[in-house]
Amino acid sequence: MADHQASIPAQSSHQPEWQRSPRRGLQIIATLGLGAVVLAGCTQPDGGESAAGGTSSAVESSTAESSAAEQTEQLTFEKQQVAELDVEANPVPAAAAKLPEGFDLQSHRFGRGEWIESSREGLENSLEMGVSTLEFDIELSADGVPVVWHDTEIDAEKCQDTEPATNDDPKFPYVGKLVHELTFEQLSALNCNKNLDDFPDAAPQDDNRLLQLSEVFEIAADYPDVHFNIETKLEPEAREDTASPQEFVDAIMDEVEDADVADRTMIQSFDWASLPLVRERDAEIPLVLLWDETTWESGSAWIGDVDYDAVDGDIVEAAQQLGVQVLSPGHAVPYGQTPRDDDYHPVATPELISKAHKAGMAVVPWTVNDEDTMREQIAAGVDGFITDYPSTGQAVLKEK
């Protein structure tokens, strides 16, 4: 994903009920005056306690039992009516028509909060549970193989060396090297099975080898309804660290076409310069505009030919210029805040969603991990969200 600062039986072609029926609603945040808190308190999926916020109708108690009860109480959010998504208003209606139907639950890096990130196990479990979209990143190896991995550099916190791919390999050890410096054979010698402090509950694995894009399509072949949201993991502020945007687009699209999944594939990027290259390759593939407060600003290297000042910071106007189908913002400013925080300011507000829908664009924020934020964003009217916890997202979507 989208994180700028994450033998299976054949699947039925029938979509889960929660996926067929998107929920619309009203975000709550007292400072914005858009809704009301009914109850307060919830534990985040990573086990950490949420910051206190909102109003509780319960009388304060000093007992441990009352404190525990308050922590498990739930925020609720009233519906907000937003404009319907007008596909025909999109700059490329045929591309907008290919977006997933219903609410788009996207498994970020194959659900890295539940399984080791970008792992085969996470991929298979995400498919089996019935997510609508697999969200993942692509790096290019030295020999041009599109590799399913988020980081430009092999991080010792995630991966460990096993043995060199060849005797006396001068590149060994591989940890600490750029992905683009190593061949896929060398990358395959890495064991990227480490649990991260931020995701302590991810199921441990003895062995996790990096996947290539073609393997994702092979593993997902029995799931004809699943979509793929593929990020070109480019670094416009350090172009020398990766392959070129054109090389990324060509390598990814070659695999997409070989697997015959173009009708279920979206291409996303923070590096907006890569998106027109995708459109040149495929006139009808959906494009996803990624941004957060660090990339969408005047003079940013991330926004390609878009002039921030000329559009007066209007993200929808910028998206129209690029001909995209999905707006995908970091879910809040500051990023990571939740409705329990006093300074929670969601980016995907009902106002932005309505404006985007009138322009023919869906809104799918990242990375939405706690239940409160999931409920608030569903109520605000988002068309989906990207999450490290797809099981949590699925459970919240069933609350009707």
Features from the language model and the residues they span:
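Classical Sec-dependent N-terminal signal peptides that target proteins to the secretory pathway
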Residues: 33-35
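Phosphate-group recognition and catalysis centered on beta-loop-alpha active-site segments
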Residues: 2-8, 14-30, 42-60, 65-400
